[in-house]
Each structure stands twice: as structure tokens, then as C-alpha cells.
């Protein structure tokens, strides 16, 4: 019995007895994922050139998970604007020039059978914090060390972090556009899905 026949048999069994297997495929809005084991987005803070570009580390990290059998691989928090990064070492999709660095990762992970998604994020008042390569863990990074002026819905700071500048209405609309543009870049690169990060106290959950 071929692998496809085995999958079809499992799916038929799930339909008849009301149970679903962990390794059964599932379809969401026309997108079929090969199983129900997914790699969640977990930030590695490894864009060490501080340019938002993925590196050979990211290739190994994500493609090996795809080869290992994950049904969906969701790439870590990826900033829609440079000032929206959680740290200077975060990935980004805020510019067309970043797209080519992603293509080989996505293409090879999909060739290994995984469905590829990316989590888009803007950290708002929790941006510009430290990462392992530059220090300042749980602190705001000084501008001379690669940090930047952070923004938020108000000028209220988060804990010990620097005070943000309150966003204007026009800036809020511009950030909405940033999410849209990053999503279109992800689509053009070949990602199958986009996840909007609206938790953990980042910008969307700050309003």
C-alpha cells in the first residue's frame, strides 16, 4: 500500500468513527497541511547583521524542521518595519530587497513537504530590546548600540523599558500598510500562510 493510500485510509477511518489522527492531513480554507504537528513561531534573535535578513542558520533551522516531518513550519516574529523589531537581531520583511534572502529557505522547506507560514509583527513599545549577541536583555538598547526611538499607542512605558513616542493617526495607518506590504512580500516569496502577531504585549495588543 502506497503512502497516499495509507493516508486516504486513515482519513476515511477518521470520518467514520469521529476520531482524527495526529498524522492525518487537514485542510484549512483550501490549504492542505500534511499533518497536525506544527512548528510554532519562536524567535531565535539570530539576524546578527541587524538588517532583518535570514542567515544560513535560519536555513538550517527551518529546512531541517521541514525535513523532519513538521506539517507546518511557522517562521518566527518577522518585523514589518525596522522600528517594529523586538530586538536589533530580529528578522524582517519591510523591504523588497529582503525578499531574495528568504526564497531559498521557503522553497527548500516546501520541497521537503512542509507548509510554510510566517508570523508578522510590530513590537511597538516593547521594541528595541536586547538580544544575546549585544546584551541588554530585558532592557532597551541604547541608540549608540543599535537601538532606536520606540513608538506606541501612548507615551506610557512598558516596565523598565524606554518611554515610547505616541503614534499619530497617520502613523497608525502607515503601520497598517506595512503589515499589508509585508504580507504581499510573503506571498510573492512563496509562503503559504501569514500569522499576525497580536499577543504578548506587542503593538496590536497595546491598543
What role is predicted for each listed range?
Residues 121-191:
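Non-globular sequence segments
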Residues 2-123, 130-132, 163, 175, ...:
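N-terminal capping/small domains of soluble enzymes
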Residues 84, 127, 203-205:
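Short, function-defining helix-loop hinge/capping sites that tune catalysis or transport
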Residues 167, 195-207:
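Polysaccharide-binding and catalytic clefts of secreted carbohydrate-active enzymes
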